[in-house]
Amino acid sequence: MNQVNRRNFLRLAGAGAAAAAAAPVAQAMGQATAGQQQQQGKPDTNIADAAKTPRGPNAMPGLYPGRVAVVKNSASVKDNAIVEQQVYDMIARSMLELTGEKRLKKAWRKFVSPGERIGLKVNPVAGKSLSTSHEVVRAVIAQLGESGIERSQLTIWDRREFELTDVGFTAENYPGIRIVGTEQMDKDGLYYGKDGKLYGEHMIDRDWYYWADVEGEYDEYTMPYMVNGGKYSYFTKILTQDLDKIINIPILKNAGMTVTLALKNLAFGAISNTGRLHAKLWNETCAQVCAFAPVRDKVVLNIVDGIKGCFNGGPGANPQFFCDYNTIIAGTDAVAVDRIGYDIVLAKRIAEGLQKEGSPTALEFMLQAERLGLGVADRTKINLKEVILG
């Protein structure tokens, strides 16, 4: 296919490819939950390889295993708009509650230092209406700056660079900060370079991979969103080579009867060839990918954007199920953060009549992550510090 035809083909295919790439997610979640997949006959994976790399000093679950700070503030949304100063105050309070520090700078400096390359892992997948909000990201950047972290140290990243751009994570909106994704498109709308390879192929690190005995097979529409097929999912060089530490900033939303928060944002954002993993290995992927060193040893903090979110129809954007949670969740323990986030979403689903009670299978990926030593899934062992500002 020549460049002109490829340009037209890929531009026309973009929306369809995105839908095709997302389709396995909806299929895997359904109205039940990813946790209700058959547990027998699971495909093999290389999870045993994760333990071969010694745990680093910042390894998950981080400085505060089992500790989660939740800050709620009804004033964080006014006339359907997020109030940035309120969000700033909520994040600041969550940092103080999490660390026990009295000064905000000292709280932040427990996790990051001048000179380090710091990645902000956002989630732009559902489009402008249901992505990590700019108000939350700007508040995090502002507080990092006040703590001595230069903008040149920061990278905002996710799987697909063009999705970041679509929702406003651009150089114009974030001057001095690198914006990058694994899967890329050039200024002409092309996914392929002059060498005939996807730009994304140059962004994956073939020395680091998650192998699963499930074949990834994609058509021409979908391949730019997957980078490669086969049984290997490669970690992005953004993680393995470009960054020292990660601050994970997912959005509070459901996925069927479970949630897609910290672990999912990390796992499916870190690797290529993910379409093959949803149907049979959704839970395993959420937990196991986070056990590999590029994720496990670099994620120092999770800040869940729970200002606006959804309680049904997720992880895609279905406006009839949007809601104002007016909440920030913070913790170093991604498993515990997900467990508390699940409780919040579950309470809303029960209030809306979608469920009468929780489903144990909805916790499956958290329980697997706990068994891998990544954090605390047992609610009775989580130290929840909850503050209501208004």
Where are these regions (language model features)?
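Extended, low-polarity segments enriched in aliphatic/aromatic residues
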Residues: 40-114, 125-127, 131-138, 142-390
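Compositionally biased, intrinsically disordered low-complexity segments
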Residues: 7, 28, 139-140
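Composition-driven recognition of long, low-complexity, acid-poor segments enriched in small hydrophobic
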Residues: 18, 22-26
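N-terminal secretory signal peptides and thylakoid transit peptides that target proteins
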Residues: 1-17
